[in-house]
Amino acid sequence: MTAPKILWIDGVGSFALCDSNEISIGQAFPGNSVDLAIRGDISRNAAVIQRVGEDHVLQPVQPVFVEGTSMDCPVLLADGMKFSLGRVEVQYSRPSKLSSTARLELLGNNRWQPLLTAAILLGESCVLGAGSTCHIRCPEWSEQVMLFRNGGEWFCRIPVTANVKLNGEIVRAPMPLRVGQRIRGDEISMILE
């Protein structure tokens, strides 16, 4: 299992990039080895989300409430669906029908540990920008950035007009997305950890 990496975007937030076909969710406490940890009233191992083809399936470890109905069997997640793990409410969204990438957001007062804006369940691509179909909304950006998978590696495609520098050097072509890289442009500033 690959632990999610965190994408920090200046002025926007921090996002867990979940690249595995199976993501575990549970309570945040020392020694708990879930992929996505939540500070809240939730069991240590509450659920698993599996990628099945282009879809995501919620596999409850404890009973969950999906749209208000108690479920203890696998549930196919749909755009906009809300589910509760203990007293923690989560919303699943798929902003673009052209991508299997989805977004998990906590509703209410609970928080991810480490502190995140959202968790991104990666498919083959992830779009960052101001548009409503972007997986990561960056309201002040006039350009879109595309993260895409090629083989087992992730790449970043940034428009030429964005004047982007990678570790201080101007970039014109898609580049591998690597931990520790600082990507900066006129509106864009982000780093993967």
Language-model-detected regions and their locations in the chain:
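Glycine-centered tight beta-turn/hairpin loop motif at sheet-sheet or coil-to-beta transitions
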Residues: 10-12, 31, 85-87, 185-187
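Forkhead-associated
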Residues: 17-79, 118-187
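Surface-exposed beta-loop interaction hotspot
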Residues: 69, 73-131
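A structural signal for short, hydrophobic beta-strand segments that form beta-sheets
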Residues: 1, 92, 192-193
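Short polybasic amphipathic segments
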Residues: 3-8, 63-66, 102-107, 162-166
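A generic structural motif
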Residues: 7-9, 50, 107-112, 149
